[in-house]
Each structure stands twice: as structure tokens, then as C-alpha cells.
């Protein structure tokens, strides 16, 4: 099978802020950092990019600026999810001709739709655009699980091309591949099990760890996709503390603090109701950065 457009180490990029406002100069530097590090793709304004506390106008501007800064050197995936189908469609339409390579759309959160509701939600979004759509299943945050059987149904829609699975349940991968087809893209949304998912036929990871270990994550994924799992595992083990400890508090709280400690962004701040990493958690994240050899 040919290498799909969406593969390897795709960073779920933080949105840098100064005094509560998006810092576009720092965003430009972050995009350049990932291009130079070999990152295979950028998710702009996903969960890690604080999508829920940006306005629609800010969402669109950040994504369009990310496309501008990337300048065709790396595919940009737009976070366009919402728990209101109509809002997700508005976001998707606003970005259809923006230069993004595709959209990542989270399972509707809080309102807990049925499997049929999720199917109709994604079907309506896909029919509103020609852009490739990636489903995003993260039941620990949404309260709802997009079942493999529903993913299989959605895979029949031509521009629904893949799924980001953030359950960490590796038993789902072969079932999804069976129901959705071998060409359906499976991207792990769980750094700790990302390499294992690639051993089972997954194509990559949409990664939080990549924010602070971009070159290592890119190399690990390249080795894994080449079948060099022992070499990939050596990198993975060095990063394992990060994979876990960047979730010691709700994402993206720890990763923004870690990026700040590495000098990648000038402030670790987030918009309320998210707050900066607690003093009690900081030594744990610092130790993980040290174990990874990043400081």
C-alpha cells in the first residue's frame, strides 16, 4: 500500500499565547521548528491547540496562519470539531479553500449522541466539503465512544479517510481495519501506545509528545513504518515518561509548560478554565524531559 498523506509523527500543536492572546510570531517559529525537525504533519487547533477556548474567528485565523507559515512544506490538518453539527459544518466550510490538507473532527462531546447520531453528524460534515475527513475518538474527554462498527459505516463515505483513536485500546485496531478496509488510515491518539499501534498496521501518531520531542518522534515513526521496530523502541522507551507525564494534568496544561521550559514558547499560560501546571506537578514533567535527554 502506498504511503498515505497522513502518516508518521503528526504534532497536535499547542497554540502559543501572550497575555491571553494568540502570539502569531511564536506560532510561525513553532511551524518552522516542526518543518526543520521532520514532523510529518500538523494538527492546528485541536484539543492541544485549545480549540474549545478560541472563538470561531480565532480558530479560522490560527489555522490559516499555520497554512501560510508552512508554505506547502508540511500538511496541515484543521481541527474543525464541535458538539453542534451545524457549527462543525460552518468551520469546515470556512476552511475548505484555505489550503489545509484535511480536517480532524472530534466526536461530539457532552451531549452524548447515539451511534446513529454520530454517524449522521459525520456524514453531514463530510457532505459539506471535498476535504478529507479524519474521525477523532477520545471517549475519556467526550463521554461517548465511536464504535468500530460505526467507523466501518463511515468509511464507506468517500472523503472520510481515517480515524484518530485515542482510546489506547489496541484490540480495536484490527477490528477497525477489518470493518473499514486496509486503506483506511489509523492514527493513534495515544503517545504511550503509538508505536505498538504501528506494529499492528497503524500509519502513525497524532502526538502531544511531538511538541517537545519533534525530531525524536519523527525518527521513531519513520523507523517503525520501515519495519525497524527495535530501533524505534529504543527511542520510544526514552520518551515513555513524557508519553505518560504530559498527561499528569489535563492536556495541554503539562505540554505547554514543558514547551515553555524548553524555550519553544515564551509563556506556559492557557485560557481559563485551564490553568498553568501546578507547582506540585512541575518536578514530574521536568524529570520526564530529563529522561528524554531534552534538558
Swiss-Prot record:
Instruction: Give the main location.
Output: cytoplasm
- UniProt record, GO biological process: diaminopimelate biosynthetic process; lysine biosynthetic process via diaminopimelate
A Pfam family annotated for this UniProt entry: DHDPS
Catalysed reaction, written as an equation:
L-aspartate 4-semialdehyde + pyruvate = (2S,4S)-4-hydroxy-2,3,4,5-tetrahydrodipicolinate + H2O + H(+)
Catalytic residues, chain numbering = 136, 164
What Gene3D superfamilies has UniProt attached to this entry?
Aldolase class I
Q: Which GO terms describe its cellular component?
A: cytosol
The residues listed in the UniProt record as binding pyruvate, with positions renumbered to this chain, are 48, 206
Q: In this UniProt entry, which residues are annotated as the site Part of a proton relay during catalysis?
A: 47, 110
Q: Which cysteines are joined by disulfide bonds?
A: none
Subcellular localization, per the record?
Cytoplasm
Keywords linked to the UniProt accession: Amino-acid biosynthesis, Cytoplasm, Diaminopimelate biosynthesis, Lyase, Lysine biosynthesis, Schiff base
Q: Which PANTHER family match?
A: 4-HYDROXY-2-OXOGLUTARATE ALDOLASE, MITOCHONDRIAL, DIHYDRODIPICOLINATE SYNTHASE
Family annotation (NCBIfam families): dapA
Please report which protein family the annotation says this sequence is part of.
Answer: Belongs to the DapA family.
Q: What does this protein do?
A: Catalyzes the condensation of (S)-aspartate-beta-semialdehyde [(S)-ASA] and pyruvate to 4-hydroxy-tetrahydrodipicolinate (HTPA).
Q: Write down what this protein is called.
A: 4-hydroxy-tetrahydrodipicolinate synthase
| Species per Swiss-Prot/TrEMBL record | Actinobacillus pleuropneumoniae serotype 7 (strain AP76)
Question: Could you tell me the gene encoding this protein?
Answer: dapA
Amino acid at each position: 500500500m502506498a504511503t498515505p498523506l497522513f502518516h508518521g509523527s503528526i504534532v497536535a500543536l499547542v497554540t502559543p499565547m501572550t497575555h491571553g492572546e494568540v502570539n502569531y510570531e511564536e506560532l510561525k517559529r513553532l511551524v518552522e521548528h516542526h518543518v526543520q525537525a521532520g514532523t510529518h504533519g500538523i494538527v492546528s487547533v485541536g484539543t492541544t491547540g485549545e480549540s474549545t477556548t478560541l472563538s470561531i474567528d480565532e480558530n479560522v485565523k490560527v489555522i490559516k496562519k499555520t497554512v501560510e507559515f508552512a508554505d506547502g512544506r508540511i500538511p496541515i490538518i484543521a481541527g474543525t470539531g464541535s458538539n453542534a453539527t451545524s457549527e462543525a459544518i460552518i468551520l469546515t466550510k470556512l476552511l475548505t479553500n484555505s489550503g489545509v490538507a484535511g480536517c480532524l473532527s472530534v466526536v461530539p462531546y457532552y451531549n452524548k449522541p447515539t451511534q446513529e447520531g454520530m454517524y449522521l453528524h459525520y456524514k453531514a460534515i463530510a457532505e459539506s466539503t471535498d476535504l478529507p475527513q479524519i474521525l477523532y475518538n477520545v471517549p475519556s474527554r467526550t463521554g461517548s465512544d465511536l464504535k468500530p462498527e460505526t467507523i466501518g459505516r463511515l468509511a464507506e463515505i468517500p472523503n472520510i479517510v481515517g480515524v484518530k483513536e485515542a482510546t489506547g485500546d489496541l484490540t480495536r485496531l484490527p477490528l477497525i481495519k477489518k470493518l473499514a478496509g486496509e486503506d483506511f488510515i489509523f492514527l493513534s491518539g495515544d503517545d504511550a501506545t503509538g508505536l505498538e499501534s504501528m506494529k499492528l498496521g497503524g500509519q502513525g501518531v497524532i502526538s502531544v509528545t511531538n511538541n517537545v520531542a519533534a525530531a525524536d518522534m519523527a525518527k521513531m515513526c519513520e523507523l517503525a513504518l520501515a519495519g525497524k521496530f527495535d530501533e524505534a523502541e529504543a527511542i520510544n522507551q526514552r520518551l515513555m515518561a513524557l508519553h505518560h507525564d504530559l498527561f499528569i494534568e489535563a492536556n495541554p496544561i503539562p505540554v505547554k509548560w514543558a514547551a515553555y521550559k524548553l524555550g519553544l514558547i515564551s509563556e506556559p499560560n492557557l485560557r481559563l478554565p485551564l490553568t498553568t501546571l501546578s507547582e506540585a506537578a512541575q518536578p514530574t514533567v521536568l524529570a520526564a524531559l530529563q529522561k528524554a535527554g531534552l534538558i
